[in-house]
Amino acid sequence: DLVRSRGLGDVYKRQMKNLILIGMPGAGKSTVGVVLAKQQGYHFVDSDLVIQEQTGLLLHEIIEQQGDDGFRQVENRINADLAVKHSVIATGGSVIYGREAMQHLKKIGVVIYLKLSCESIAARLGDLRKRGITLREGQTLQQLYDERVPLYERYADITVDCENKSIREIVAEIVARLPK
């Protein structure tokens, strides 16, 4: 674990020192990201907004026009090209399907998985399509959750259990666990 921590610190210091938040929609990536960025004196980047700016379309419009696979290709390409420094990046929940995007994000910063139970996520979410959540026909949120969690865990440098914690507590835990 010490070797892993030391390696993480090297990446953090040598690279662009970004903090990348991954997790299910509704896990709090954008909310935590804004507070974390402010506290660390970092910029805040919402990759979903970058996608919307670069395509000129809302997420659900991309999904309607290009389908789920088309959306994921756009998401993968744009995240793989993100060139930011000293930023907290809140990613879209499906970013973990893009291998190029995740390899790039791991190269430019520390990947932090905001973990929350499926029940808590379901309670927070409204219209899934408007949130850019791509469920296949007949797929439940639980099935999507079960599909994505192993990917979040695989790519995470740090996993933060967000269950029953305030934004302030989550941010404090992230800061405490960052490489020194």
Write out the residue ranges for each language-model feature.
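P-loop (Walker A) phosphate-binding loop of NTP-binding proteins
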Residues: 24
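ATP-dependent small-molecule kinase phosphotransfer cores
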Residues: 49-95, 99-106
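A glycine- and Lys/Arg-enriched "phosphate-lid" helix/loop adjacent to the NTP-binding pocket
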Residues: 107-150
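Single conserved hydrophobic/aromatic residue that forms the stacking wall/gate
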Residues: 1-13
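Walker A/P-loop
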Residues: 30
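Hydrophobic anchor at the beta1->P-loop junction of P-loop NTPases
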Residues: 21
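NTP-dependent small-molecule kinase module
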Residues: 35, 39, 149-180
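ATP-binding Walker
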Residues: 27
